[in-house]
Amino acid sequence: IFECVFSCDIEKEGKPCKPKGEKKCSGGWKCKIKLCLKI
């Protein structure tokens, strides 16, 4: 579990949880209440 900002814009392994401009997290990540979770 990694903390993330409201926009879910964190980086994991060099890739953003949610690329800028995207409304949903990608790369196997999901944002839940300011947390980026691996799914």
From Swiss-Prot:
Locations listed in the record: Secreted
Signal peptide per UniProt: none
UniProt GO cellular component terms: extracellular region
UniProt-listed PROSITE patterns: HWTX_2
Pfam families in the cross-refs: Toxin_20
Disulfide bond positions: 4-25, 8-31, 17-36
Tissue: Expressed by the venom gland.
Membrane-crossing residue ranges in chain numbering: none
The keyword Disulfide bond appears for this protein: yes
The keyword Disulfide bond is assigned to this record: yes
GO molecular function: calcium channel regulator activity; toxin activity
Keyword field: Calcium channel impairing toxin, Disulfide bond, Ion channel impairing toxin, Neurotoxin, Secreted, Toxin, Voltage-gated calcium channel impairing toxin
Entry's family note: Belongs to the neurotoxin 12 (Hwtx-2) family. 06 (TXP1) subfamily.
Function: Inhibits voltage-gated calcium channels (Cav) in rat cerebellar granule cells. Has insecticidal activity.
Note: The primary structure of the mature peptide is identical to that of venom protein 1 from Brachypelma smithi (AC P0DL80).
Name of the molecule in the record: Omega-theraphotoxin-Asp1g
Natural source organism: Aphonopelma sp.
